[in-house]
Every structure is written in C-alpha cells, then in structure tokens.
Amino acid sequence: MGRLVFVSFGLLVVFLSLTGTGAGFCCPLGWSSYEGHCYKVFKQDMTWEDAEKFCTQQHEGSHLVSLQSSEEVDFVISMTAPMLKLGLVWIGLSNIWNECTLEWTNGNKVDYKAWSAEPECIVSKSTDKHWFSRPCSKTHKVVCKFQA
C-alpha cells in the first residue's frame, strides 16, 4: 500500500510539474512554448506575404505571430533579441487583405497596439516593444506562432 501511494504521488508530481510550467512538451522540437502557443524565430529574410505563407507551411494552424499583450511581446523579444540583435521581424498584422481595417493573419481581434500610424504591413523591433509600418514588399526576419 505504501509503495502504491509513493508511486501515485510521484506520478502526480511529474504531471503537475509538466503541466504547471508550460514546459513546452506540446511544441515541436525547436519551437518555444508560452501561454498555450508555440513560437519559432526564422532568420530568413522574406516579404510579408512570403513570410505568412512560410509560417502556414511550418505547422497546422501556424501564422505570423499575433501579439495580444505586453507580456507576450516581452516573451517574443526574449526569443528574438539574442538571435537577431537589432533586427526587425514581421508580425501578422497588416491591412493587405482589407484596405481600411487592420487584421491579424490568424483572425484575432486587434486588441493590443504599439504604433501610432496607419500601416500597410507591420514589423516589430527584435529588442523592444516598438512597431513600425513598412511596405509589404520589404524583407525582414520571421516569427511564427500556433496554438498548442
């Protein structure tokens, strides 16, 4: 009886440690986990449209990263800053599909914003929370995201 309790307790501890920390066990190798989503930085330079297409080919449900909070931006910066130094990365926000309304490529509502001008396609600095509009034909690095 004592062994059963010990083994059961041990399994419970392992389960809670994996599920409680978001240890990334749901994300494929090379992807990082945050709040139930998987993220990956790609160093290739691409146009916005090519970057979105590239992300959709990386994993089912994947798109250019959508940023829903300041905390999520901090997480993405923690990934991009060491890899890309002072670079710019495409995010999944543009008005390329609808001339007057900004939309995330994954269909999420635009709740969190970090720029002041009406953009065409949006890049984020790899080292801070600033967003900039850029012509969609320019090339930048890529961050992809999907729900785990």
Curated annotation (Swiss-Prot):
Gene Ontology molecular functions: toxin activity
Compartment(s): Secreted
Residues in C-type lectin domain copies: 34-145
Major subcellular site: secreted
Segment forming the signal sequence: 1-23
Taxonomic superkingdom: Eukaryota
GO CC, alphabetical: extracellular region
Tissue: Expressed by the venom gland.
Keywords from the UniProt entry: Disulfide bond, Hemostasis impairing toxin, Secreted, Signal, Toxin
InterPro entries recorded: C-type_lectin-like, C-type_lectin-like/link_sf, C-type_lectin/snaclec_domain, C-type_lectin_CS, CTDL_fold
Cystine pairings recorded for this chain: 27-38, 55-144, 121-136
Family (UniProt): Belongs to the snaclec family.
Assembly behavior: Heterodimer; disulfide-linked.
Function summary: Interferes with one step of hemostasis (modulation of platelet aggregation, or coagulation cascade, for example).
PANTHER family in the cross-refs: MANNOSE, PHOSPHOLIPASE, LECTIN RECEPTOR RELATED
Other remarks in the entry: Shows greater sequence similarity to the beta than alpha subunits compared to other heterodimer snaclecs.
Designated name of the protein: Snaclec crotocetin
UniProt source species: Crotalus durissus terrificus (South American rattlesnake)
